[in-house]
Curated annotation (Swiss-Prot):
Domain of life: Eukaryota
Gene: SU2
GO cellular component: cytoplasm
Subcellular location: Cytoplasm
The name this protein goes by in its record: Eukaryotic peptide chain release factor subunit 1
Gene3D superfamilies: 3.30.1330.30, eRF1 domain 1, eRF1 domain 2
Gene Ontology molecular function terms on file: translation release factor activity
UniProt-listed InterPro entries: eFR1_2_sf (IPR042226), eRF1_1_Pelota (IPR005140), eRF1_1_sf (IPR024049), eRF1_2 (IPR005141), eRF1_3 (IPR005142), Peptide_chain-rel_eRF1/aRF1 (IPR004403), Ribosomal_eL30-like_sf (IPR029064)
Primary role: Directs the termination of nascent peptide synthesis (translation) in response to the termination codons UAA, UAG and UGA.
């Protein structure tokens, strides 16, 4: 696929999958120390890892507790079998999790996971514990491009970061600077000198705090820095010898904003968006902004809600599918007394409030559950079947929040106008859809 946007969207889906996996693995707990976390970095050898596992097997054979010994040996064997699936370490490295976990009902369940991460994982790890270790995976997500922001005005300064679609305020402080003085004579010179001194101290304090916030272990911890503010403070800082040279070389944009503080930070993100280009926060705002634009222009080229969006997908009408990354909808596949499959999408609240949907209309009994899975996971696997692009969004931007609260966190930008009312009339029963 040569389309960079499509590649970016696919990468975002991979990132989303890893986020979900981390959540699941972090929650898992074992009985004893039989949960194996194995990470092999790129360019390492499968044979080295296999040799190490063989040695571990020998050591584990001496564990005194019979139950724990058997669990550990079983987990090592599962890990060895996973390794046999690979002739060599994939370009981005290899991550393997194997072991027995305790389910919420207290039963033991085997977990065997192996995958190549979406970007190189430069960590070598082997741990046998009562939990899975996901720290290296979490770092992989965090090491997305991060930008630093310094917003200065006459009332104070704010230090912030933007990474992916996560915006953080790292530090802020207020300042009380004397205003320009109107009196003449010697007092005017004295006030001007005092004022200049206070401004100088303010710029110096910002320069010092910039080092504290944006340099870790003598290395700049952001991809680039945006200086923002009203008046000349940002330019004074940029030109000042007090501003650490390592940071000065990272300044990618200087922008004028009308406010200080958090509002100024938001405005600076907007104004620097072109320079930041690929940061997901901006992409998210643009994408949902485009969705809202279709609504305000009344083009009819949008859909929202699970059911209408699925109908539009079935028609092949959805150009871009937009889904909230934490959408809590379950996809149920049920079977009625005639053997017909019925698919229902519902939230936990809907399940509790409306059990009628699960009842067979002819017999009045509950229908057989064929399968039950997260709608998000299902759509992440099947979106390509509908000829659409899938974009996950957060609720951290104003637009994202509005999309989740006002439109249920799922919708699409359509290739052409679809008359959903007409489609609903065609459906005999708009609660159930056959595949």
């Amino acid at each position: 696929m040569s389309d960079p946007n499509a590649n970016e969207a696919e990468k975002n889906i991979e990132i989303w999958k890893v986020k979900k996996l981390i959540k699941r693995l972090e929650a898992a707990r074992g009985n004893g120390t039989s949960m194996i976390s194995l990470i092999i970095p790129p360019k390492d050898q499968i044979s080295r890892a296999a040799k190490m596992l063989a040695e571990e097997y020998g050591t584990a054979s001496n564990i005194k507790s019979r139950v724990n010994r058997q669990s550990v040996l079983s987990a090592i064997t599962s890990t060895q079998q996973r390794l046999k699936l690979y002739n060599k370490v994939p370009p981005n490295g290899l991550v393997v999790y194997c072991g027995e976990i305790l389910t919420s009902e207290g039963k033991e369940r085997k977990v065997n996971i192996d995958f190549e991460p979406f970007k190189p994982i430069n960590t070598s790890l082997y741990l046998c514990d009562n939990k899975f270790h996901t720290e290296a995976l979490a770092e992989l997500l965090e090491s997305d491009q991060k930008f630093g922001f310094i917003v200065m005005d006459g009332n104070g300064a704010l230090f912030g970061t933007l990474s992916g679609n996560t915006r953080d305020i790292v530090h802020k402080f207020s300042v009380d600077l004397p205003k320009k003085h109107g009196r003449g004579g010697q007092s005017a010179l004295r006030f001007a000198r005092l004022r200049e001194e206070k401004r100088h101290n303010y710029v110096r304090k910002v320069a010092e705090l910039a080092v504290q916030n944006f340099i870790t272990n003598d290395k700049v911890n952001v991809m680039g820095i945006v200086l923002a503010g009203s008046a000349d403070f940002k330019n004074d800082l940029n030109a000042s010898d007090m501003f650490d040279q390592r940071l000065a070389t990272k300044v990618i944009k200087v922008v004028d904003v009308s406010y200080g503080g958090e509002n100024g930070f938001n405005q600076a993100i907007e104004l620097a968006s072109e320079t930041l280009g690929n940061v997901k926060f901006i992409q998210e705002k643009k994408l949902i902004g485009k969705y809202f634009e279709e609504i305000s222009q009344d083009t009819g080229r949008i859909c929202y809600g699970v059911e209408d969006t699925l109908k539009a997908l079935e028609l092949g009408a959805v150009e871009t599918l937009i889904v909230f990354e934490n959408l809590e909808v379950t996809r149920w596949v049920l079977k009625d007394s005639n053997g017909a499959e019925i698919i229902i999408h519902s939230t936990k609240q809907q399940d509790a409030a409306n059990r009628d949907r699960f009842m067979d209309k002819e017999t009045g009994q509950e229908m057989e559950v064929v399968s039950q899975e997260s709608f998000l996971e299902w759509i992440a696997e099947h979106y390509k079947d509908f000829g659409t692009t899938l974009e996950f969004v957060s609720d951290r931007s104003t637009e994202g929040n509005q999309f989740v609260k006002g439109f249920g966190g799922i919708g699409g930008i359509l290739r052409y106008k679809v008359n959903f009312e007409q489609l609903n009339e065609v459906d005999d029963d708009d609660e159930y859809y056959d595949d």
